[in-house]
Amino acid sequence: MEKTYKLPIVLGTDPENTIRIDKLPPLKGAFAVHIHESETENNAHIKLEYGDTEYCLSLYVFNYPKFLRNETVRVRNYDLWPKWIMFAARLPNGKLHPKSGGKVYREDAVIVGEGNYELENPFISFKYSDGRILNFRIEFYRYLRYKSPKYGPSFRSEYWFIGVD
């Protein structure tokens, strides 16, 4: 019989009660990579389908070009968001993503990549729809105090995603 897990549905307002990517059970699903035009050019947000919940897990990647080269990068967990935002953005050609449902969650979001991921701690792999495959080992780095515009004082967990062949 396959073991079932209950995924944590919490927000990062307490370091003892925040989602730790490196502690999650095995997960797999769709992902979408968003660039926000108002933010630092090299950074990206990766939205991971969060099991069969109504949420996606948002990861902030510092230096997306290095990520695409499968090099070590720092990644911050930006917690859970409603799953509908995964594809609610424009494509680089300016058109809405076909799965957007006609919605845009923020005007400056552009989807620059998508595919499927698989998390089997401490490893995560990203299989892009163009055939590119990236594999990383996840290493917890630290908790960071953070002032969320939406939730106020929060904690975010940060990780090193270490590229593996």
From Swiss-Prot:
It comes from the Bacteria. The lineage of its organism: Bacteria, Pseudomonadati, Aquificota, Aquificia, Aquificales. This is Uncharacterized protein aq_1075.
